[in-house]
Amino acid sequence: MKPRLLTTVTTWLALVLPVVYLSRPCQALPTVNFTANYANSTSIASYNLEPEIPYEELEEPRVLPLKAVLPVEASTVDSSGVIDASKSEHHELPLADAAIQPHPDSNSVLKVILEQPESNDEPVTSTHGYPTFSADDNFVPSKPLNLSVLEVTSTTIKITWREPEKLNGAIHGYRVYYVHQNQTLLHLPILKAEAAVNSVYTYTLSNLKPYTDYKIIVAAFTKKFDGEPSEVSQRTDIAGPSAPKVVNLTCHSQDALFFGWRIPQTYYNTIDYYIISYRNVVYADFREIRITANASIVETSMIIPNLTTNSLYEVKVRAASTSVINPKQIILGSYSEPKKINVQLNCEKIPPPSQRQSYNDYNLAVMIGILICCFGLLFIVLTILLWKKCFHAAYYYLDDPPACGNSGGGNSAGIVDWEAPCEVAGEMRSSIPVCEFAKHVAALHVDGDIGFSKEYEAIQGEALNDEYPSEHSQHPDNKAKNRYLNVIAYDHSRVHLRQVPGQKKHLDYINANFIDGYQKPRAFIGTQGPLPCTFDCFWRMIWEQRVAIIVMITNLVERGRRKCDMYWPKDGTEMYGVIAVKLIREEVMATYTVRTFQIKHTKLKKKKASQTEKLVYQYHYTNWPDHGTPDHPLPVINFVKKSTAANPADAGPIVVHCSAGVGRTGTYIVIDAMLKQIEAKNQLNVFGFLRYIRAQRNYLVQTEEQYIFIHDALVEAIDSGETNIKMDAIGGVVNHIEFIDSQYKLITSYQPKEINLTSALKPVNAIKNRSSLVPLEGSRVHLTPKPGVEGSDYINATWLHGYRRLRDFIVTQHPLIDTFKDFWQMVWDHNAQTVVLLSSADNMSFLQFWPNESEPIESDYYRIRLVSETSENDYIVRNFVIQSIQDDYELSVRMFENPMWPDMAQPRSIFDFAVRVHERCAEYRNGPIVIVDRYGGFQACQFCCISSLAMQLEYDQTANVYTYAKLFHNKRPGIWSSYEDIRQIYRILSYMPKELGLLKCTELRTEFDEAAIMTATPDLSPLTRPAHIMSQHYNRFLKLLERWPVDQSKIGRDLGQYLRDQLKAVLGGTNIIAVKDERLVRQHQSLENIVNDVHLKAHPRSLNSTATGLSGEQCREVLSSEFLEYLNKEGGFEKLGLRGGRWMSTEAVRHVPVMAAEAIKFLKPQDSELFIDMTFGAGGHTKQILKAAPNAKIITLDRDPVAHELAQEMAKRYPGQIYPVLGRFSELPAKLKELNVNQRSIDGMIFDFGCSSMQFDEGERGFSISKNGPLDMRMDKDRCPDAPSAADVLARIDEMDLARILKVYGEEKFAKRIARAIVEARHSIKKIETTKELAELVQTCCASEFRLDKLQRPSHPATKTFQALRIFVNNELNEINYGMILAQHYLKIGGKMITITFHSLEDTIVKRHVMGNVANDMANKLPLKYCSHTICHDQTVMDAALKPNWHQMTKHVVVPSDAEVEENPRSRSAKLRAVVRVE
């Protein structure tokens, strides 16, 4: 709003002031000078009287009443003020009448008349003249009234308003402003205030942007001033989409065209329709087809039917969108370029015109080819001559630094100004000051992170539009070098390996790109996780590019999938091509591992021997989930800082890789660049930098979740600042109270929500808590639950990480009397052999929870016995043995009681105690350290902090108190009560001796398994535990399995009983020898988990629970090493009904017709009657009909060519009775016409829906889960080879549609999760092309490796996904719908129809037809764009056909008997309906 200005106008008035005194004659008054200031339109702010004679010469009283006159307005207004001129020369005079409004741009006269009070005479007025009075912008017009919008289009907005209520002068016109996106202020030329009806004005804003928000401002103005503004906001309407791009127009058949197009490049809001216009060029008019559209689908296609053969057709398409102003209005877009094509017979066999060349064109191409070959040969000869002249025959190259200009075809050395503001997707983007970044991120987080979604979509959109060449990645010689098909290396920025004499040109390829850092071109090399075939290329790149730091952000195997191969030696030295790599040292930390390699070039010549070897450091981050983000950004920030700081100034780029080299790799690079930009310029631009580096390698920062994590990490980095404190500076920090207090506030800023404390706040668990210090759900320690006992898995204990391991400590409260056994259960379950007690027993609230030497503690599974107790200088050491009651397994536990820690006599004793504890733990290295204080709070967490930070100080002479304190608080809020707690940690660390030895006694060595390497810091207990202990665990498992409760209500269906019987039969009395072969670890499913999951409903427990008293981890160790090894060797899996460690599928069973007896009972076939077996399959039902009526005639229909062949064979055995027909339900009318079968002539029809068992038996058909094969699922792929397979559907479908398919057709409760995983795998790994790939991917998305069917039998978790895809690919539900209609038309009155369904949707369609309650969309809720064809019916014909004429033969649906289900498991979900055709 334009501010009101104050302008002072001074008017000198020469006034003749007559003064009349009572009882005295009138005499002339002196002339007085007058000064007036206008404060607003209704008052005079001040005036100044300057009489020509002194005041004291005036006779008493000197009271001068005042009258103000405005002659221009032809009115005189008396003021209510009386002025005493003797008291002051400065007075304030309000004009009481607010109606007086002087015109500031007109001549006004102010006349002041002084008169004698109480005089009856007329005032004497003497005026020397009226001076000119002018005012300032105090007098501005008020707001225009009733500003509103009349009409809106995509580029115009018509507005209207009325003139202001207060004009305050002559209105010269109006100014109209409009604001676009709060950044671009545009104003229109001045509008002349022309006459308008009733003072109503209109104006049309033009040349606006479609679908854009505008704020419109209107203000009146006078000759000198702008008035107060009125505002209104309005969004313009959408404009029509741009022209779609036609990508396919082919002749589909003699009367149909196949037409495909791509979504328009530009559209607003959404695309609602496509309008396809086509015409025979003989005619002028176009015909139109309108179809609904989905803006998320990039390519759309359809078949245009009912065309004239041997005609030329012209086709074009345009998109249309619904108006956002008027939903009833459709905004049409531009037409695509018209395309023409001939429709003719057998056109599908004729190549398109683009492939047919004229004879002259062919000759020209041949001539050009010959010339190219000649030049090529000449070039090769010259190249060979030059090579022989300039190079030695031996293989070598010099160790020169890579040129910055062109050592690999990389991006330009110049720095692109990505920091400059730019407009993307209609919005301005620029660098954000550090002080405003937190507010900026908070704004992006609102409304479900909608701001992040928009920014990331803008980046993704640009990436899709940028088509950078990647020819080398697509070369046949190089495709095998790409881990993922769609993650390639752009040619312009890829890293070139130096040529080896004699090698092919394309052997210089590696899937790696140069990526710029902040103000440093080619600061990084982003690459994929090396494959075995690229190990040598990878190490050549390390050597040639002078790399000193490798950053690895992936584990070798994640979620059962190999993400990277181990490209370095496990021990010693290995050769990778010409590079020898030796592992020198390995330091394992909780979240990352640092490895030191010595690499040597074995073929290098012309260099000193000392320069043939280099040291390379690998920083391997091991706690970053695939496609996800870490739980907290602090460890990542520290990792980025340490790894980048380790790179020497004269070294080459830092090589960063994850699995694909795009998602986590890009996240790392962006965080580093932004940290450097903050340091250099105190600002940052995440959007601009990521947008810039995406032109150097595709898919950098692969998910929106990673993009959000970058912002959150940078907010944390800005808030916390530098948190690593050097050893010699720690003492100074102790006295820096403000610094510690600010850290404390940040450390304790996180406040958990109630959902994070679900278990701790349950009433059954609340009594187990001493205080408000309770564990969060994500970090609490779980106990082995007791069947049927709620809360039996809870204990007030929290996992905390240490310097070496993620689960190094368990912090817990002093046990209550009711939780003594829970405490020892925790020690037993998690194999914790070291306990630190920092509280003392007082025989009141804090009781002794350990046994005396004469009184052991017993539970249902174990006995705790005190072995010894000794006192040392500052603490007491107790040794316990926990003995299993079922077997002879023992667990030794040592307890250190030190209630005075850290208030000990000598500072050195604080650290000596920590060393002593960790030395004890190092003896076993197979479990956590349990730390106990009164409430599981400050004292226990202080011990964890001190011991972890002492190791850090030994390793790199820095301590990060802030990180440990904050992460501990986030896992157990409330442990720090004041900044003094943090200060005390700094104080203790300042006493730390330089040589402590704590780091050495906790040293870990990464153990890698040859088959499945899960993490760089695994639990090493299986490798250190004696073999006889493993056997004891196994024996315990067998014994306790026998005690598993048996469900007597379902004889023969109880899995527990089944397993027990089979175990006895298979194992007998065999003694199993412990096996140490690591290759078997975690390759097979735990039998224990199967038992638990099967009985989950009857005996509720968590999925991680066990029935044996063993922990889930111990069961996996036992079963994966000893038991499964034995079963593999002895064929035990087959004897157990298991295959390869997993449950056998029930698919592979002999073909038995389902409910054949019931079907024949209702069908009642008679000789000479005509039947149709609508789903012949293997002919089971047909055989039963012929058995009941030997002379009956049967038409056998099946879409499967294999089934059709079986029908033909049967027809040879029954000549004149079997009539095989190959086709779908929808094709039956034409087939029956060929057989001269008319409507109302069939005596009975039988439907057995679903997939036949022989289709499951053949893996190459693509239906089977247990047998690997191509993911096909087409029942009639030989007849319709162009129809999309299941693999085609998964390669093209979007996530939303896929989730809907799985949800509706498969009734899959994990539909969204599975759909997301399939789409992510398609983009980041490869397209899913085999049944095994799909089955394994679905399995990773489910909570268990099997599910229970309706008979409580284990089935594969991918069963429902396969079912949904099969139904969709084969358009089964639509076919069922057609089948029901055909039955109504072809059955005689009295004819019978038998339907057998296996899916709820199948039965629903049948039921609705039978009941006469058909919903037209029942079978077609999903888009049919992936189906092989679309069949359209006239609506009136459909309505007539769907009239019900059925009588049900049974009141309820018929289900199979228990005996049949046992004999034929496929029948378990079958439902039979029998109906009769009536009038």
Swiss-Prot record:
It catalyses: O-phospho-L-tyrosyl-[protein] + H2O = L-tyrosyl-[protein] + phosphate. Gene3D superfamilies: Immunoglobulins, Protein tyrosine phosphatase superfamily, Putative methyltransferase TM0872, insert domain, Vaccinia Virus protein VP39. SUPFAM superfamilies: (Phosphotyrosine protein) phosphatases II (SSF52799), Fibronectin type III (SSF49265), Putative methyltransferase TM0872, insert domain (SSF81799), S-adenosyl-L-methionine-dependent methyltransferases (SSF53335). GO terms for cellular component: plasma membrane. Its EC number is 3.1.3.48. This is Putative receptor-type tyrosine-protein phosphatase mosPTP-1. Interacts with C-type lectin mosGCTL-1. Interacts with C-type lectin mosGCTL-7. Residues 452-717, 740-992 form the Tyrosine-protein phosphatase domain. Residues 387-1479 are cytoplasmic. It is an enzyme of class 3 (hydrolase). The keyword Transmembrane applies. The chain crosses the membrane at residues 366-386. Putative protein tyrosine-protein phosphatase. Its main location: membrane. The active site is at C658 (phosphocysteine intermediate). GO terms for biological process: anatomical structure morphogenesis; neuron development. Belongs to the protein-tyrosine phosphatase family. Receptor class subfamily. It is found in: Cell membrane. Pfam families: fn3 (PF00041), Methyltransf_5 (PF01795), UQCC2_CBP6 (PF20180), Y_phosphatase (PF00102). Residues 143-242, 243-346 form the Fibronectin type-III domain. Keywords: Cell membrane, Glycoprotein, Hydrolase, Membrane, Protein phosphatase, Signal, Transmembrane, Transmembrane helix. Residues 1-28 form the signal peptide. GO terms for molecular function: methyltransferase activity; protein tyrosine phosphatase activity.
